[in-house]
Amino acid sequence: MAQNFTKLNPQFENIIFEHDDNQMILNFGPQHPSSHGQLRLILELEGEKIIKATPEIGYLHRGCEKLGENMTYNEYMPTTDRLDYTSSTSNNYAYAHAVETLLNLEIPRRAQVIRTILLELNRMISHIFFISVHALDVGAMSVFLYAFKTREYGLDLMEDYCGARLTHNAIRIGGVPLDLPPNWLEGLKKFLGEMRECKKLIQGLLDKNRIWRMRLENVGVVTPKMAQSWGMSGIMLRGSGIAYDIRKEEPYELYKELDFDVPVGNYGDSYDRYCLYMLEIDESIRIIEQLIPMYAKTDTPIMAQNPHYISAPKEDIMTQNYALMQHFVLVAQGMRPPVGEVYAPTESPKGELGFFIHSEGEPYPHRLKIRAPSFYHIGALSDILVGQYLADAVTVIGSTNAVFGEVDR
């Protein structure tokens, strides 16, 4: 039987190959530098304009969800670092928050203060990282150098607290592993000053830069309807003009006690999204400045008290036989949450990050599902890129701030 060579399956199954001097099909990635070997876009072009974009993912798939169903609840925590690896503390917290909701644990106030500080510090580090590499993609190399210098100070603080700079593993189910080191808050105050100065410097380089604005304004426009239909969240959603932040709508930890604003865009373009990242850095500084005096007013416990699910403090394990046996059982066999299911959303630097956990009362989740914001934002490229010039594709992809560790799970 004669074969039909007008189609190539599966990637090109929806493309009709008809001769047109003005149209062509271009594979953007995975070798392209801006895709980091993790994204392939099949672009249909008419001249220099994109008329169709088909994202293809899966190049970084590691089976993170299935791993979670074959590990005990505590064993899985370090794996969450490898989702959005530019803001790993947010992943740690989102997973811990879901398990704690399932277990109905009460978290000590000091642990809540430390967690919220770490989350906002992590948000600033992630935002300044995005701004620096986005500027580098567009061609502003100086911003990359200045921003990375300031980011290093933030990573030093994370290293002083948990010993790691990238994959922090700084949160535990039930609290935090460590109290803040001596003089750590003084270093944090100094970092906030450094961040303010860095932000002013970057704004001086970019805000009124004619080339920067020409490359970003009216490029990659996301309308409110498009944002809602694709399930966008975070700055991708707020940039379109919709004021939705889970820290305000469904507050967790201490956010309901804190005074902060939710910046919202007007035009939904790449420049709006850049501006929102800068404004959110201000809000994170504002939040941390409210949390620092709260720390001194809290008591010393940093882990929840529940022998069925949480190990006793280390000093008790070393001196009390019952605490040692309970710790051995939790480590060797794992905790056994009650039968049920839970979905707990959080506001990560990229958007809504949530974990769905279905428990059958066993040491392993029966089903674990990760709702990662970058997955939805990459899918939306098939709408956002249509009508854009090929030269603007890198700008649009960069403005989504997608990390493929959480896209390919």
Swiss-Prot record:
Residue stretches spanning the membrane: none
Location of the protein in the cell: Cell inner membrane
InterPro entries, per database record: NADH_Q_OxRdtase_suD, NDH1_su_D/H, NiFe-Hase_large
Keywords in alphabetical order: Cell inner membrane, Cell membrane, Membrane, NAD, Quinone, Translocase, Transport, Ubiquinone
Reactions it catalyzes: a quinone + NADH + 5 H(+)(in) = a quinol + NAD(+) + 4 H(+)(out)
EC number(s) on file: 7.1.1.-
One GO location term (cellular component): plasma membrane
Membrane topology per record: Peripheral membrane protein
A GO term for molecular function: NADH:ubiquinone reductase (non-electrogenic) activity
Quaternary structure (record): NDH-1 is composed of 14 different subunits. Subunits NuoB, C, D, E, F, and G constitute the peripheral sector of the complex.
Family indicated by similarity: Belongs to the complex I 49 kDa subunit family.
Protein role: NDH-1 shuttles electrons from NADH, via FMN and iron-sulfur (Fe-S) centers, to quinones in the respiratory chain. The immediate electron acceptor for the enzyme in this species is believed to be ubiquinone. Couples the redox reaction to proton translocation (for every two electrons transferred, four hydrogen ions are translocated across the cytoplasmic membrane), and thus conserves the redox energy in a proton gradient.
Protein name per UniProt: NADH-quinone oxidoreductase subunit D
Source organism of the structure: Helicobacter pylori (strain Shi470)
Lineage of the organism: Bacteria, Pseudomonadati, Campylobacterota, Epsilonproteobacteria, Campylobacterales
Gene assigned in the entry: nuoD
